Amino acid sequence: MPRKGPAPKRPLVKHPVYGSQLVTQLVNKILLKGKKSLAERIVYGALEHARDKTGTDPVITLKRALDNVKPALEVRSRRVGGATYQVPVEVRPDRSTTLALRWLVGFSRQRREKTMIERLANEILDASNGLGASVKRREDTHKMAEANRAFAHYRW
């Protein structure tokens, strides 16, 4: 444990093109091997693709998708007297956004479309409609928390 306390959170700048912190976070999640311009190109292309399909503001579509993917509960392992229990805990808002973006990007990488732009755009569109693998992941997480509700009194 550090003696000075937790490190302060660095403020995220709003994205210069879309004016949203969520787009900045999405670009940083897509980023591989320091190629930020490539990550930005992928995100811009995916958001334009989403705009063409829906005809609405892509940032609103992204927010709706994230709201459908953000988990409210998760399970954490807690060791009590030689047994390990999966204890359901509430997820902090910043962690739920991070998890949602991680799942969105991770499952878009596993999709079958040809380019990453198409994969990301279609995963965002599916998630905004309540479909897709990332929404299923959230449902599975909630089911796991519900199944282990008996251990909720072990929360810390």
Curated annotation (Swiss-Prot):
One of its GO terms (biological process) is translation. Gene3D superfamilies: Ribosomal protein S7 domain (1.10.455.10). GO terms for molecular function: rRNA binding; structural constituent of ribosome; tRNA binding. Keywords: Ribonucleoprotein, Ribosomal protein, RNA-binding, rRNA-binding, tRNA-binding. It comes from the Bacteria. Belongs to the universal ribosomal protein uS7 family. One of the primary rRNA binding proteins, it binds directly to 16S rRNA where it nucleates assembly of the head domain of the 30S subunit. Is located at the subunit interface close to the decoding center, probably blocks exit of the E-site tRNA. Part of the 30S ribosomal subunit. Contacts proteins S9 and S11. This is Small ribosomal subunit protein uS7. The gene is rpsG.
